[in-house]
Amino acid sequence: MTGRYSRQELFAPIGPSGQKKLKEARAVIIGAGALGTASAEMLVRAGVGSVKIADRDYVEWSNLQRQQLYTEDDVKKEMPKAAAAERRLRSINSDVDVTGLVMDVTAENIFELIRDASIIVDAADNFETRLIVNDAAVKEGIPFLYGACVGSYGLTFTVVPGSTPCLHCLLDALPIGGATCDTAGIISPAVLQVAVFQVTDALKLLTGEECEPVLRSFDLWKNERSEVRAASLKHDACPSCGTKDFPFLSYENQTKAAVLCGRNTVQIRSSITKEADLEALAGQLRQAGLEVAANPYLISCRSDDMKMVLFRDGRALIHGTNDIARAKSIYHKWIG
């Protein structure tokens, strides 16, 4: 066998019939950073028929250490990640319908984005977006493959609506906020390990196999790994998959962002962060090399031409831009 997918078809759990199912499948990837590009490349090489990848950001020098689809030329041209990823993925496999979407994923546009999707792969850079996607996935009955990593640590769980707990059910078991890749760093093996778990489950689901409801976590540097059988964590009263209220699709539970008139500043009020631990956050930001000032009411930090002021109630001012998408990107890089 010398065909493009011959070695994959020789793998008995997939075979020629599974390969046909992959060709008919549609994957949507939320985020085109490290996780998104790794998962996208594997899915495209595997022959998944349609791959959409959505991201609001552009390629920077600090991305090249772990975001495998991008080049120095993309940085110099300030290419949007989704556009650069689309071009590269099309060059890898012209048989796949690849669409890169330069957009901020919100409750307002999520249903158009995931229309007709077979699976949704999480590669978002913040937890609020994940909860929006989780609610939409549960509502539409589309499997959602959660994944996150920072430092040498990673975490994955596959949500199968109607069968497994959803992400909302697992909130008490998941780390929300805190360290980010921009404050604690990241090594590429951790990214790839998470993507491996996500794409393996994606291939299983797309070829008709079931996935176990297992919450997987690991720390590669410490050579630690754990698995939690998560079926018992499903809550009948969960507002997302239980009572089907889908709270994160409502306006009241979304991050509010507004451009402040005449100030080149965006105000952001997170729906998740109710009260910030300013002291702990100041320490993280200083460790990341940012210039930080603090008083009992707020902290401020600078990086290049951008300044962020964070108040104890979780409200933030991003100075140096009037672009809401850019301000959100900076906020989630520094705050999580």
From Swiss-Prot:
The keyword Nucleotide-binding applies. The active site is at C181. SUPFAM superfamilies: Activating enzymes of the ubiquitin-like proteins. Pfam families: ThiF. Zn(2+) binds at C166, C169, C238, C241. Its EC number is 2.7.7.73. GO terms for biological process: thiamine biosynthetic process; thiamine diphosphate biosynthetic process. Catalyzes the adenylation by ATP of the carboxyl group of the C-terminal glycine of sulfur carrier protein ThiS. This is Sulfur carrier protein ThiS adenylyltransferase. It comes from Bacillus subtilis (strain 168). The gene is thiF.
